[in-house]
Amino acid sequence: MATKIDKEACRAAYNLVRDDGSAVIWVTFKYDGSTIVPGEQGAEYQHFIQQCTDDVRLFAFVRFTTGDAMSKRSKFALITWIGENVSGLQRAKTGTDKTLVKEVVQNFAKEFVISDRKELEEDFIKSELKKAGGANYDAQTE
């Protein structure tokens, strides 16, 4: 059966993360049968990492705050998590299903495909987002 996405529900969750006034900084999009629907959401990145278990595949939209003391800004990441115990067929299907998620999640600084929990570390993601942002204007120390 072809995968579908609940666009309205997923768009509402996506917009919640994009809203700077919202405490929600991440949302997952998971499979409910053959439909992609919003999953968990939260205000703590560590709670997101707990969703990424070896037997699950999911997509996540995450807001990170970057910059220095003078200039804070939000950067967004689209993360595809594929656990180690996910079957080969499901792994392959995740890649094509991501196009459905991208119909909703359109604005992000960098995309990640991760199956190793070490790559989910917040510092690693932030450093990759910083590289993707181009020039580094952090306050210089002399």
Curated annotation (Swiss-Prot):
Flexible and important for F-actin binding: annotated segments: 66-75
Keywords associated with the record: Acetylation, Actin-binding, Chaperone, Cytoplasm, Cytoskeleton, Nucleus
Reported tissue expression: Widely expressed with highest levels in placenta, lung, kidney and peripheral blood leukocytes and lower levels in brain, liver and pancreas.
Residue ranges of domain ADF-H in the record: 2-130
Origin: domain of life: Eukaryota
Pfam families from the UniProt entry: Cofilin_ADF
UniProt-recorded Gene Ontology molecular function terms: actin binding; actin filament binding; enzyme binding
BP GO terms, sorted: defense response to fungus; regulation of actin filament polymerization
Residues where N6-acetyllysine is found: K102, K126
A Gene Ontology term for the protein's cellular component: ficolin-1-rich granule lumen
PTM annotation (N-acetylalanine): residues: A2
Compartments, record wording: Cytoplasm; Cytoplasm, Cytoskeleton; Nucleus
Coarse class of the protein's main subcellular location: cytoplasm
PANTHER family per the UniProt record, alphabetical: COACTOSIN-LIKE PROTEIN, CORTACTIN AND DREBRIN
Job description of the protein: Binds to F-actin in a calcium-independent manner. Has no direct effect on actin depolymerization. Acts as a chaperone for ALOX5 (5LO), influencing both its stability and activity in leukotrienes synthesis.
Family according to the record: Belongs to the actin-binding proteins ADF family. Coactosin subfamily.
Known partners and oligomeric status: Interacts with 5-lipoxygenase (ALOX5/5LO) in a calcium-independent manner. Binds to F-actin with a stoichiometry of 1:2.
Protein name: Coactosin-like protein
Annotated organism of origin: Homo sapiens (Human)
Organismal lineage: Eukaryota, Metazoa, Chordata, Craniata, Vertebrata
